Amino acid sequence: MTIAIPFDNSYARLPGGFYTAQAPQPVRAPRLVAFNADLARLLGIAPGEVEEMAQVFAGNAVPQGAEPLAQLYSGHQFGNYNPQLGDGRAILLGEVLGSDGIRRDIQLKGAGRTPYSRGGDGRAWLGPVLREYVVSEAMAALGIPTTRALAAVETGETVRRESALPGAVLTRVAQSHLRVGTFQVFAARGEIAHLKRLTDYAIARHYPDAQGPMGLLAAVRDAQARLIARWMGVGFIHGVMNTDNSSIAGETIDYGPCAFMDTYHPDTVYSSIDRYGRYAYSNQPDIAVWNLAQLATALIQQAEDKEAVVEEATEIVHAMPELLERAWLEVFAAKIGIARPGEGDKALVSELLTRMAREQADFTNTFRALGAPRARDQFTDPTAYDSWAEDWRQRLTQEATPEAVIRAANPAFIPRNHRIEQMITAAVEGDYTLFERLNTVLARPYADQPDHIDLTRPPSASEIVPATFCGT
């Protein structure tokens, strides 16, 4: 085997109760459809022949040094606790230390049944695999912490969902797959030794300066506050912010029914399973606080003096809304050209958003257009913009380089939902042209790319995607 992956597997050295050793299940006729060469270089992976990479990234050939396993976790799903979830379709091959010194997991998603599959087939179909590949790489290019996509492979098999669909496997890369739910499962079971071991492991891996469980809680809080603010700044809606999808490392993980807003409205929901809007765009900061409270509840279980720790944990959690608001304001102030927000700037941003919602303005294009004299064109009634812009321009007289700040904070290109659906439809028919084009264009989201201006346009009435689906 010529492909070389320099594994160093710390999670596999934890006690067996953290995971189950599980080899991927081979597939019939793997075909490599995407390989992220830049990410491979960062990870120190020496690629092999295309045929060989197809075998490895489909799970047919386990590379030397891998210790494949499925991780155990539980979690709150739409507010209801599920005591055992775990990797039902994913296999962690192992970890590598990148050239940047960061340890990362390499995981095969859609690699077959595990002890945690709960009756599922352990497989994924092509659509969600390509969606996660495109969207996660777009998020990375936007500068938002995220899992990454190393490879996508067609399996040559069909999976049965609403109909027979082409199977696929995604190779996902993450700083870890530790979730809030990883802590919850041991706390709920009263396995305090495992909970302490997990806490020490998470601190050593992600936050070496954190002091004990409450230091870890504060570090996760800060990372999540920064992350959610960045989501809000690009109109990203995760769609399924369960605690098992909340990353301890502060990365976006488990894209499922994710979407980007076209027309701005704070209550926007795309996920077909989010029937009551729990994870709507505007609710995401509050849900992040709720998820942090569940992590706090789990971490507290290892304390000897629980009363004192409860008080400290409460203070840490209660500080998160203010941190979120501060991070949100920094993000949105930059979007209107303000490098260091001050008094009155929140009201200025909020008033623009109110008018955008009322006038059904496109979220991405409106903010991008603030750097050019065309933002008023995004409003059905341009005078709604004009009256706000008077106050805004007056505020910008205090800024040195507002145009540069606007361009750096506002992408021209995002993975618009209708383009993702068009890409999937074409790929199922064997045409990867749009998939490849999206990956190329979205790698430079802040650059003007005149040849691809069509990818900045909102959907027509017939192209609107009203709902998104997990679909894996």
Swiss-Prot record:
Keywords: ATP-binding, Magnesium, Manganese, Metal-binding, Nucleotide-binding, Nucleotidyltransferase, Transferase. It is an enzyme of class 2 (transferase). ATP binds at G86, G88, R89, K109, D121, G122, R172, R179, D254. Mg(2+) binds at N245, D254. It catalyses: L-seryl-[protein] + ATP = 3-O-(5'-adenylyl)-L-seryl-[protein] + diphosphate; L-threonyl-[protein] + ATP = 3-O-(5'-adenylyl)-L-threonyl-[protein] + diphosphate; L-tyrosyl-[protein] + ATP = O-(5'-adenylyl)-L-tyrosyl-[protein] + diphosphate; L-histidyl-[protein] + UTP = N(tele)-(5'-uridylyl)-L-histidyl-[protein] + diphosphate. The active site is at D244. InterPro entries: SelO (IPR003846). One of its GO terms (molecular function) is magnesium ion binding. Its cofactor is Mg(2+); Mn(2+). Pfam families: SelO. Its EC number is 2.7.7.-, 2.7.7.108. HAMAP family: YdiU_SelO (MF_00692). Nucleotidyltransferase involved in the post-translational modification of proteins. It can catalyze the addition of adenosine monophosphate (AMP) or uridine monophosphate (UMP) to a protein, resulting in modifications known as AMPylation and UMPylation. Belongs to the SELO family. This is Protein nucleotidyltransferase YdiU. It comes from Ruegeria pomeroyi (strain ATCC 700808 / DSM 15171 / DSS-3). The lineage of its organism: Bacteria, Pseudomonadati, Pseudomonadota, Alphaproteobacteria, Rhodobacterales.
